[in-house]
């Protein structure tokens, strides 16, 4: 455009434009520290560089700052200046010993602050000043032993606070004053012995509280009373031992209660009073022995109940009566149950899953009622006999009456019954009964001498019925018989049958045939169950393989569109402000023990063009 005569003005214009462009790019080009691995202006990665202090001259447009894995002992108020757009600051695993008050005062748009896995021993008031928009604060795996009152005063927007695995022993009055937006509080794996009655003041919006693995000896019911919105409470791994009356008063919205491995031996009558909306209760790994009608009488909406790995030996018939319409899952495995009356389970009309394995079941007549109830129920429950030894390992559903009642009749015990003043027999009747035993009984094969005795309950044996029929006809003519031992040279085994006297040869042959048929049917049933199990496993394997193939195809299809999954995207969205939010409580039963860190969601709000452009980002590990 410029000729030779205008070369000097053109040169001046060129220099002016160049200087202007350099000024515009100054913050992007010259603002990044040369020691950092990645500096895009939006994201700065200074991970694992052994830095002893925070570098200077970061661009003001920085959104992510990664300082993980360094050797930064102290953070003062002059090190994090000018970062007005910073959203996430990672200072974890950096050997931090102390953070000075007002160290984050200029980070007014900070949403996520990671100070976990350091050596911070104390938190002084003013340390979080200026963090009015902070949502998530991570302080786990430090050495904090005490939190002074008011230290969290400035965190009015924090919804998630993680203080697990510190050295806290006492939560004093007003520890969390000012945290009116807090929804999740994790205090697990500390040494907390006592919680002040006003320790949770201002936490009316708290939804999830994790106090597992501390040293609480009783439920701090007075401290819980202010937590009107609490939905999930974990007290597992505390030496509580007993649930005192009204331990959970005020927690009307509580739905999930974890009391695993808390040495609980007793639940008082009103122990669960006030939590009528409870849905999930976990009492695994405790020392409960007896369950009665008062234990769970107030939990009318309970859906999920785990009682495995206790020492339960008895359950009253009406223990689960009030939760019959709601309870769907019940776990009674790994206890000391030997019998269970069907009336215990009959009220549970909504039950879909029952576990009772690994109990020392005694397969006798007491379990026949349970077997019959299970046969008519839609619930699948595998109970295997532990006693008697002859039935060990056999499934309850294969046990029938012939296996349950088989006994020998001993004459010596019959004489003990005869000795009773209420029972008298004619000598003639006794001899007739003895003649019937020796003539119509089982073949006499053994020539050894032994004592033959009868059951105590004479009416249940044919010989006893014979005595009664002949002895009580004319009680005035009866003669008392002295109890003496009768020595016989044969052993007599009398099998009890329902509608017959002592078996004759024909009855004996019929009984043997019936027993053989029963055993064959049992073997066929067992074989069928084994084949059915293999078939189900094969179907599951086929479905799993199909699922994996479909998943693999989806991955291949996704890889065609993008070679690499990225968590952050740049320069694809118009100027806007994006609000970062996180889901509060995961309600999956599998996540009850510890709070999972939820995936972050972003909601876009359009702003005028003259405001600073903020990138859209996703972060799956916050």
Curated annotation (Swiss-Prot):
Residues 359-406 form the LRRCT domain. PROSITE patterns: LRR. Glycans are attached at residues 215, 266, 331, 400. Pfam families: LRR_5, LRR_8. Disulfide bonds: none annotated. One of its GO terms (cellular component) is plasma membrane. GO terms for biological process: positive regulation of response to cytokine stimulus. It is found in: Membrane. It is a single-pass membrane protein. Keywords: Glycoprotein, Leucine-rich repeat, Membrane, Repeat, Signal, Transmembrane, Transmembrane helix. It comes from the Eukaryota. LRR repeats lie at residues 61-82, 85-106, 109-130, 133-154, 157-178, 181-202, 205-226, 229-250, 253-274, 277-298, 301-322, 326-347. Residues 32-60 form the LRRNT domain. The chain crosses the membrane at residues 527-547. Expressed at low levels in many tissues, including smooth muscle, brain, uterus, pancreas, cartilage, adipose, spleen and testis. Renders cells highly sensitive to the activation by cytokines and lipopolysaccharide (LPS). This is Leucine-rich repeat-containing protein 70. It comes from Homo sapiens. The lineage of its organism: Eukaryota, Metazoa, Chordata, Craniata, Vertebrata. The gene is LRRC70.
């Amino acid at each position: 455009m410029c000729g030779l005569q205008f070369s000097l003005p053109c040169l001046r214009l060129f220099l002016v434009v160049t200087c202007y462009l350099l000024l515009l790019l100054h913050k992007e080009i010259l603002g990044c520290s040369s020691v950092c691995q990645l500096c895009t202006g939006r994201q700065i990665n200074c991970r694992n560089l052994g830095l002893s202090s925070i570098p200077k001259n970061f661009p003001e447009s920085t959104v992510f700052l990664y300082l993980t894995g360094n050797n930064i002992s102290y953070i003062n108020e002059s090190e994090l200046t000018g970062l007005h757009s910073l959203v996430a600051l990672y200072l974890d695993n950096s050997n931090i010993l102390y953070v000075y008050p007002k160290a984050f005062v200029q980070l007014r748009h900070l949403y996520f602050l990671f100070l976990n896995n350091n050596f911070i021993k104390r938190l002084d008031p003013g340390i979080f000043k200026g963090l009015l928009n902070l949502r998530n604060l991570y302080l786990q795996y430090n050495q904090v032993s005490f939190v002074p009152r008011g230290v969290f005063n400035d965190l009015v927007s924090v919804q998630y606070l993680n203080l697990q695995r510190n050295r806290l022993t006492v939560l004093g009055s007003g520890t969390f004053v000012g945290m009116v937006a807090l929804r999740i509080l994790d205090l697990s794996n500390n040494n907390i012995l006592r919680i002040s009655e006003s320790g949770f003041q201002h936490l009316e919006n708290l939804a999830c509280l994790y106090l597992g693995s501390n040293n609480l000896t009783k439920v701090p019911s007075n401290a819980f009373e202010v937590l009107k919105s609490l939905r999930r409470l974990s007290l597992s791994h505390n030496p509580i031992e007993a649930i005192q009356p009204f331990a959970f008063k005020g927690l009307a919205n509580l739905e999930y209660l974890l009391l695993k491995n808390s040495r609980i031996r007793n639940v008082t009558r009103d122990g669960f009073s006030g939590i009528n909306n409870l849905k999930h209760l976990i009492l695994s790994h405790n020392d409960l022995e007896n369950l009665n009608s008062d234990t769970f009488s107030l939990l009318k909406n309970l859906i999920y109940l785990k009682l495995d790995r206790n020492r339960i030996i008895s359950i009253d018939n009406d223990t689960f009566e009030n939760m019959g319409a709601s309870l769907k899952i019940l776990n009674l495995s790994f206890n000391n149950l030997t019998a269970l009356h069907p009336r215990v389970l009959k009220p549970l009309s909504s039950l879909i899953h029952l576990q009772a394995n690994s109990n020392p079941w005694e397969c006798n007549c007491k379990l026949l009622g349970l077997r019959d109830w299970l046969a008519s129920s839609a619930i699948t429950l595998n109970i295997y006999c532990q006693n008697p030894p002859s039935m060990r390992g056999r499934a309850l559903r294969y046990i029938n009456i012939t296996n349950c009642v088989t006994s020998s009749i001993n004459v010596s015990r019959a004489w003990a019954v005869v000795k009773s003043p209420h029972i008298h027999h004619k000598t003639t009747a006794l001899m007739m009964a003895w003649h019937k035993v020796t003539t119509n009984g089982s073949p006499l094969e053994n020539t050894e001498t032994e004592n033959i005795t009868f059951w105590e309950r004479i009416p249940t044996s044919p010989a006893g019925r014979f005595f009664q029929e002949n002895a009580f006809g004319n009680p005035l003519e009866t003669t008392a018989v002295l109890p003496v031992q009768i020595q016989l040279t044969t052993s007599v085994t009398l099998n009890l049958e329902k509608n017959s006297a002592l078996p004759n040869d024909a009855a004996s042959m019929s009984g043997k045939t019936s027993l053989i048929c029963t055993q064959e049917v049992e073997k066929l049933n067992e074989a069928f169950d084994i084949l059915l199990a293999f078939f189900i496993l094969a179907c599951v394997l086929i479905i799993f393989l199909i699922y994996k193939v479909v998943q693999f195809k989806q991955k291949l299809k996704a890889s065609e569109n993008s070679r690499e999954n990225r968590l952050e995207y740049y320069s694809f969205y118009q100027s806007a402000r994006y609000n970062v939010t996180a889901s509060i409580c995961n309600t999956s039963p599998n996540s009850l023990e510890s709070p999972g860190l939820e995936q972050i969601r972003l909601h876009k709000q359009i702003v005028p063009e003259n405001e600073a452009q903020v990138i859209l980002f996703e972060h799956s590990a916050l």
